[in-house]
Design a protein with these regions (language model features):
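Transmembrane alpha-helical segments in multi-pass inner-membrane proteins
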Residues: 252, 257-332
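Helix-loop-helix "hairpin" substructures at the membrane interface of multi-pass membrane proteins
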Residues: 112, 195-272, 296-297, 301
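Short loop segments and helix-boundary regions at transmembrane helix junctions
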Residues: 11-20, 40, 83-92, 113-178, ...
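Hydrophobic core segments of alpha-helical transmembrane domains in multi-pass membrane transport
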Residues: 22-38, 75-79, 100-106, 127-132, ...
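Cytosolic-side transmembrane-helix boundaries in multi-pass membrane proteins
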Residues: 1-28, 34-38, 211, 231, ...
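Transmembrane helix-bundle core of multi-pass membrane transporters
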Residues: 148-219, 272, 326
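Interfacial loop-to-helix junctions that mark the boundaries of transmembrane helices
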Residues: 14-21, 53-67, 91, 116-121, ...
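Single transmembrane alpha-helix segments in multi-pass membrane proteins
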Residues: 33-42, 46, 50-110, 123, ...
Length: 349
């Protein structure tokens, strides 16, 4: 066979890769959004220019985007793993909230007693809080037969009510204009990744978590069991894979990662617990996991894409008056195009 005969086949194969379809989906979302901007009487190129400048125009803006991406990555990886194992976990929002609450309790109470050890203690508390909240949902699903979508969605609202109760009660700062706790002691703050900046080590933790999740999913027996359970219940059953163990394990991992996301947000960005501190993070994590086609490593660029879109949109709104909510259109269209592209690719196979 000649090189000329091979080349067209290689080009077709390259164009049919999942990565190419995802990139093309994002491009199409930008094109369609650009048409909507044009219909509104604005220049889409100018709008996108301000988004890019707002996200990358200065180092402080880049820092904001990286800090925002860290919890997105952590929660997104957890959701991606659950969806891979056919566990429809919609509860990352609540797990983040409980993780942030648990970390805040330790940061406030333990600063004087634990000293420098309060930071790792607070992070562990956040992880345990998120894991416990996820475990409750898994237990209800497995013991009472209530579908995980319903359980996890309802528990999101309960989690935020619990956080609100603490902030309006014993943990709330007196005479504050907003429901929040007092500022944490410096020893409870996440270390900075770059000196004299606000960039904390959360982004490193998130990237490492995504890499570890990839290794577990594709290089361990546990990961194989999760993938098998997600691919076929019958195949998993005949292979001796326990669905209950898979569901509980995946929910625990998701709770650990989401709890860590909540802890990182309160210890590294706000330095206190604030009502609504991560509102929408869990649902963004679902979109990020789907945009990444449930691949833990792909969650990294997907989370960065979401985070920098959101930070850049504020600049666009200030400069040319286009609402920052436009990024929701871009995110939504990207997700729709990706899901369509993935489904089309699956039918071809």
């Amino acid at each position: 066979m000649t090189v000329a005969a091979i080349a067209p086949t290689q080009r077709v194969a390259w164009r049919n890769t999942l990565a190419w379809r995802v990139v093309l989906s994002v491009v199409w979302s930008l094109v369609v959004t650009g048409i909507l901007i044009l219909m509104a009487g604005k220049n889409p190129l100018v709008a996108y220019q301000h988004i890019v400048l707002g996200a990358f125009g200065s180092w402080p803006r880049v820092v904001v985007g990286l800090n925002k991406a860290a919890p997105y990555m952590l929660a997104g990886v957890g959701v991606a793993l659950c969806f891979r194992g056919n566990v429809a976990n919609m509860g990352a929002e609540g797990q983040i909230a409980i993780g942030g609450l648990a970390a805040s309790v330790v940061a406030l109470i333990g600063a004087s007693a634990l000293g420098a050890a309060v930071l790792p203690a607070a992070l562990i508390a956040g992880v345990l809080g998120g894991a416990a909240w996820a475990a409750i949902a898994a237990a209800i699903n497995l013991t009472r037969g209530v579908h995980e979508v319903l359980v996890t969605l309802m528990m999101n609202f309960i989690a935020w009510l619990i956080v609100a109760e603490f902030l309006h009660g014993p943990m709330g700062e007196i005479d504050a204009g907003f429901p929040q706790t007092p500022m944490f002691e410096n020893v409870a703050w996440l270390p900075k990744l770059v000196a004299r900046t606000d960039l904390h080590i959360g982004i490193v933790i998130a990237v490492l978590a995504a890499i570890m999740a990839h290794v577990v999913l594709w290089r361990t027996v546990t990961g194989f069991h999760w993938r098998l359970a997600g691919a076929s219940d019958k195949a998993a059953h005949y292979a001796g894979v326990s669905r209950a163990r898979s569901v509980f394990g995946l929910m625990l991992v998701s709770g650990v990662l989401s709890g860590m996301a909540g802890a990182i947000e309160v210890l590294g960005v706000h330095y206190r617990l604030i009502e609504g501190f991560s509102l929408g993070f869990g649902f963004n994590a679902i979109a990020i996991a789907l945009l990444a086609t449930l691949k833990p490593l792909w969650v990294i660029p997907a989370a960065l894409f979401f985070a920098f879109l959101e930070t850049g949109a504020l600049s666009m709104q200030r400069q040319i008056g286009i609402p920052s909510s436009l990024v929701l259109v871009i995110q939504g269209l990207s997700l729709i195009f990706v899901l369509c592209a993935v489904g089309r690719g699956a039918r071809r196979v």
